[in-house]
Amino acid sequence: MKRKALLVVCLVMLMGLFAAPSLQAEVKFLRMASGPEGGSWYPLGSAMMNIVEEELGISTSNGPGGGVGNCKVVDSGRADLGWSYTHTTYNAYNARGKFEKERKNIRHLMSLYPGVFQIVFPEKSDITSIADLKDKHIVPGKVGFTGTAIAELVLKAYGMTFDSIKKSGGAISYVGYSDSAALMKDGHSKAYMAVTSCPQSTIIDLNFQPGVRFLGIDDKAFQRIKELEPGLMRTEIPVDAYKGLEAPVPTVGTVTNIIINKDVPDDVAYNIVKALYAHWDDLKQVKKKAIEASD
């Protein structure tokens, strides 16, 4: 219901655009930057662009990306639409966090489902807390991923940085989801971090082999994180999200959103939202758990 109410508000706000001459015919191609293979963004991005192409008659493409990087490519015009997170979008627009300059060409188009920060480590590891990662080989995601930026904040709340981990004998591998799984299965990495839909296919795979456990974020660390990044919220990994969990895992989260370049005509933006809303059940067939979380 929350998702439906939000979309109705978005559509009502945009309805006045029909009083102006339509510029949709001038748009010949729309490019979306989504996420890496193995996550929910890439397949959903492809499905969304297929819907837009069919309903609006505009040629489309979908390419890989990350929450931070997508704000930059949409701002520059290299992509017309992109996947990100609400707090990342705010930071990009206002030159906060990972953004060295204001990205004023981006606009929020629509909110989707929650993104949950998750940390897993091998089941047979001697790790018991985030503090134990101080000298380990960890995989926080690629540079440009929002998950990588959140991983830095979480580690900072526990008195660590990527550099301090490397100086203590650990290592950082900036790779995508599939390579992250391979590194842990091969015994090279000791922790995998990502902000994704929950459950996530990479973690389901790792939970099958080699088997994983989850690290939670305590209340004291969460308060430090909120001071560093007010846009993050308190959330948890539900006990029924993964096989073997005995209790919810406290963590931090955000909200997935779609951004759009300000130069995309308003009536095109309106028709994109309208088309996606009309095909919501089709999107559920691509990533049922993620899209249902938006309802």
Per-region residue spans from a language model:
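Extracytoplasmic
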Residues: V27, G57, G66-G69, S76, ...
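Bacterial N-terminal signal peptides that target proteins for export
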Residues: M1-V9
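Bacterial N-terminal signal peptides
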Residues: V9-L17
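Bilobed "Venus flytrap"/periplasmic-binding protein-like clamshell domains
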Residues: V27-S61, G115-D186
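Segments of small-molecule ligand-sensing domains
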Residues: K243-D295
